């Protein structure tokens, strides 16, 4: 091999690496393994992890454990779809492009907007791309107002995307400590003629259903763009669509639609907007057309916006879309149907309120008064210690908020989905009270 590549010694391959960075001691590598030994080793390593089935889980905060129908897994495992190849070229199969078109259609129906793209990396990147899209629409404005009730990792991603843009000022809008919703009076004070956009969770990071319609009104009076962000996509099966409330761009995380919680990913970002702004959208768009024989077909459209056509002037540098995840969401939504999705969303709401009632019966009080979807905040003494004690009893009690929200010391975010049962609420109460 060395002779073939034209070097005399193996060390020649690392000659460019400084001596101080090279390992001098012998590397203790185990002997080679056959396939069965590798499988046993990897299985043993995996067994050291704790999975969702090992606990009663009330964790949420941006990723949610919902039931994934077997049909979704079967469809996404088909060889026609399960491939590492990104379908971005003109010769992408009609099956793939039709699936993406159907996904886009479903997202527009959920968001109440006219156009959606083929998908984004995740909800956080979709939110950041929405801000950049707003900047392209209103290039002379430079203030981005983000509600503090937006998920902290979404805020961090937006900051990263904007860090090199010196003409953009990112400001945080405080929240009402009584309701857990965005402080509208504070937003009014920020709504000047430099306001580019507002970014609001719907529901927000506390599970609270924000008064999105009123936020949109304040935003539009300033001539700015309203961006709605939904991390728990199931909520869109029950809540009034962001577009119907006047939002200009709606983004979110579609993981709840047929994807498991697996080390926090993969996710499925979605973005939808009004048709008048379609040329400023990031990512890929699939459109419906007809071939020379009049047969219906699907193709990538408005491709000149994209980086594989015009790299320097592209609307985004999204180098791939999450087509397989989009397929899972499409299959899931098709299986559920409009009525099924609404019933499941309502079931989540009912379970969450039952869980809160059980906690209130044990003297644990809700932190906020505003309506919520399927997660809520309660106040407990020493959430860190309480969560650790609950975990020892096989219960993942929720997410402590103080690390990201110091003013919510004692706040615990509890998430409830159809994977929880009412018997679990008793275990949660006992675990937090140190019983059982």
Feature roles, as predicted:
Residues 78-90, 108-113, 139-141, 165-171, ...:
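Gly-rich Lys/Arg/Thr-decorated short loops/hinges at beta-loop-alpha junctions or inter-strand turns
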Residues 257-362, 366-369:
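Active-site C-terminal subdomain of aminotransferase-like
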Residues 1-24:
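Compact, charge-rich alpha-helical regulatory domains located at protein termini
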Residues 95, 125-295, 363, 367, ...:
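Conserved PLP-enzyme active-site core in the AAT-like
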Residues 3, 105, 361, 403-436:
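PLP-dependent enzyme catalytic core of the Aspartate aminotransferase-like
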Residues 19-102, 108:
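N-terminal entrance/gating region of PLP-dependent enzymes' catalytic architecture
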Residues 54, 88-92, 109-128:
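Short loop-beta-helix segment that forms the pyridoxal 5′-phosphate
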Residues 26-27, 43, 64-65, 344, ...:
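Flexible, glycine-rich loop/tail regions that form catalytic "lids" or insertion modules at the edges
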């Amino acid at each position: 091999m060395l002779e073939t590549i034209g070097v005399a010694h193996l060390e020649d391959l690392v000659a460019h690496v400084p001596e101080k960075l090279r390992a001098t001691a012998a590397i203790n590598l185990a002997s080679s393994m056959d396939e069965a030994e590798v499988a046993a080793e990897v299985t043993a390593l995996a067994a050291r992890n704790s999975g969702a089935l090992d606990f009663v889980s009330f964790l949420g905060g941006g990723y949610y454990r919902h039931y994934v129908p077997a049909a979704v897994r079967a469809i996404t495992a088909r060889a026609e779809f399960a491939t590492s190849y990104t379908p971005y070229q003109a010769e992408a199969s009609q099956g793939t492009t039709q699936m993406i078109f159907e996904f886009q259609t479903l997202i527009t129906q959920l968001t109440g907007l006219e156009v959606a793209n083929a998908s984004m990396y995740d909800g956080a990147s979709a939110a950041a791309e929405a801000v950049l899209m707003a900047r392209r629409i209103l290039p002379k404005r430079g203030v981005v107002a983000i509600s503090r009730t937006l998920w902290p990792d979404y805020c961090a991603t937006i900051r990263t995307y904007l860090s090199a843009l010196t003409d953009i000022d990112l400001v945080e809008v405080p929240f009402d400590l009584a309701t857990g919703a965005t402080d509208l009076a504070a937003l009014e004070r920020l709504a000047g003629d430099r306001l580019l956009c507002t970014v609001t969770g719907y529901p927000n990071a506390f599970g609270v259903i924000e008064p999105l319609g009123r936020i949109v009104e304040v935003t539009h009076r300033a001539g700015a763009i309203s961006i709605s962000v939904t991390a728990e996509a199931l909520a869109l099966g029950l809540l009034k669509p962001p577009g119907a409330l006047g939002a200009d761009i709606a983004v979110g995380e579609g993981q709840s639609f047929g994807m498991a919680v697996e080390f926090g990913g993969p996710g499925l970002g979605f973005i939808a907007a009004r048709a008048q702004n379609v040329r400023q959208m990031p990512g890929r768009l699939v459109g419906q057309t007809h071939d020379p024989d009049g047969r219906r077909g699907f193709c990538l459209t408005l491709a000149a916006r994209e980086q594989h056509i015009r790299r320097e002037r592209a609307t985004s540098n999204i180098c791939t879309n999450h087509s397989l995840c989009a397929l899972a969401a499409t299959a899931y939504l098709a299986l559920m149907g409009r009525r099924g999705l609404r019933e499941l969303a309502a079931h989540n709401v009912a379970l969450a309120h039952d869980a809160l009632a059980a906690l209130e019966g044990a003297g644990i009080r809700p932190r906020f008064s505003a309506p919520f979807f399927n997660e809520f905040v309660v106040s407990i003494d020493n959430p860190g210690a309480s969560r650790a004690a609950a975990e020892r009893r096989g219960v993942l009690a929720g997410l402590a908020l103080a690390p990201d929200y110091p003013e919510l010391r004692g706040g615990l975010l509890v998430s409830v989905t159809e994977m929880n049962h009412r018997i679990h609420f008793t275990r949660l109460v006992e675990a937090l009270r140190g019983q059982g």
